[in-house]
């Protein structure tokens, strides 16, 4: 569909609900501006470019969006594709519209930059745009819908990329926002491009049974009208509802069903005036037809995460026909079809309070708030709790994949309470959903009577009885086990609190040690009558600097920890000697310090001794890669790859120190290394991977696999033990010999 569309056609659609002349003039002003800016530009179809923003705005008008959203639709490409500037838009149309257009532009730009694969950064842009102003994404959905409808003018390989992106990202966004009609249209167009054989097969099956199906459903509609309107005198609307092609395919594929086994292809929708009437209608329907057990769903009492509300029941008619009935109010039906967009529907004369509308959506779709919270994690917080584990990209991708792009599962407590979780949730996620304190003490669960560890993935229908222990508490490995953002946040909060407590306790202990050591030194000096040999404080500090101590307190703590004897400490720092004797003592202690580091640490920190050194968990450096040390207030020196993105900012470069691998120690050690494997999914592929790793004696610490929808792309993430970079290359080369594996690469955690 790249047929020409005139502004008058779009205006006619707008005038169905916007009558104010001043508002209509402002919309026309935006159209004239867009037409001027896009003058001379053409689309791949050869059509004038202005056709695209006109169609985008037409869709927005069909959804009854407000005037500012319509104007943003007309202008949504001017910043990206024309010389127009933000300042010019602000001057002509105001800051709100300028911000909307800029928001759409940023999302579009990021999509083009990252189109080769779904990246967490792209997803972040989309969802942060929603959290800031939901209208940005509504405009973007209208934009994408028209681009899909005209996708036939692109090269086949480009069609595939855009169709996959639309199916994996934009249909999921429409679903999350409850925009069912848009979701179905995006899915069906994308599915037709990605899998034309299956698409045409289902179309053929639908067409072959279409007449019979229409007659059958019309018969049931008339039966229900007679029962509800004629006999029960209820004010209702009754009509048929068709299932989308992609949803039929997904149900056939996911549950292994035949076309004839899918009962909700046939469905009747009943619209009532009130919630009370919904339940009255349900009672009348069940009086006249036989309801199927376990096929009743009350989404009015417990709405879906995307705000969807309705009663669903599957019934059997006297003639044996099985069909679904959906019962809802007018408002629920509008929300079911348009979702969040329904909140922004423009009504003439209404107090159109944008801040209030966005606040209402934010409160009801709390996922956006959680994403904003992640965006605002402070540097200090990341320093205090192993910042590498909570990298925004990694956690963002988890949240979006687990909380938004997934189906839901329904799990039962032992007393029959239903708990809703994202698909892929574990026992640990379930425990935290029940209560934070239960989550913190969880050691496992009985699933359907059998004991299972906290990492066990749950499925719908499981009866889960959580087992706890008083001594149990969260640890960093739980961040890998947990799949839901809410559980991750609670674990993170606990670990932060624990770290603060441990650090506080350690400081108190250290202060007491320093105090005691200082008293012991003073007693020793007094007992030996050495006060006359004491040097001044300035000389003491010079001597401390010579052996890499910044202050007397750090040195006294080392003495307290038996790194030096009292006599060594006093002779070295406090007493005056002949120059030759001072140099001799200094040399002896420096040698001792260096040997101690040689024996203990696999990382040598140049110019600093007796300090805690840890391998950073974000980049997991391995011998003998180029590394650098980052001075962390809470954890000493953290060793990163020099190329690690987490230490590239200017403020972090100021806190870096030179470090090197201690070959004498690290040659006998194994180090964690994270890799990602991209492959075409097939039976026994995981078995082949584990066989190769086993043959190479590679110790696997963690492995997860994920198939992306119907596209059969398998991603395996694993952490293995390696001795050095050469060993990693050997493992990588061996994995690449496995058929259907396309990529094996080192990844950040």
Swiss-Prot record:
Reported function: In eubacteria ppGpp (guanosine 3'-diphosphate 5'-diphosphate) is a mediator of the stringent response that coordinates a variety of cellular activities in response to changes in nutritional abundance. This enzyme catalyzes the degradation of ppGpp into GDP. It may also be capable of catalyzing the synthesis of ppGpp.
N-terminal signal peptide: none
Entry GO CC: plasma membrane
UniProt cross-references to SMART domains, sorted A to Z: HDc, RelA_SpoT
Protein name, per record: Guanosine-3',5'-bis(diphosphate) 3'-pyrophosphohydrolase
Organism: Spiroplasma citri
Lineage per the UniProt record: Bacteria, Bacillati, Mycoplasmatota, Mollicutes, Entomoplasmatales
Needed cofactors: Mn(2+)
Keywords linked to the UniProt accession: Hydrolase, Manganese
E.C. number(s) listed in UniProt: 3.1.7.2
Pfam family, one: HD_4
Family membership noted in the UniProt record: Belongs to the RelA/SpoT family.
Catalytic reaction list: guanosine 3',5'-bis(diphosphate) + H2O = GDP + diphosphate + H(+)
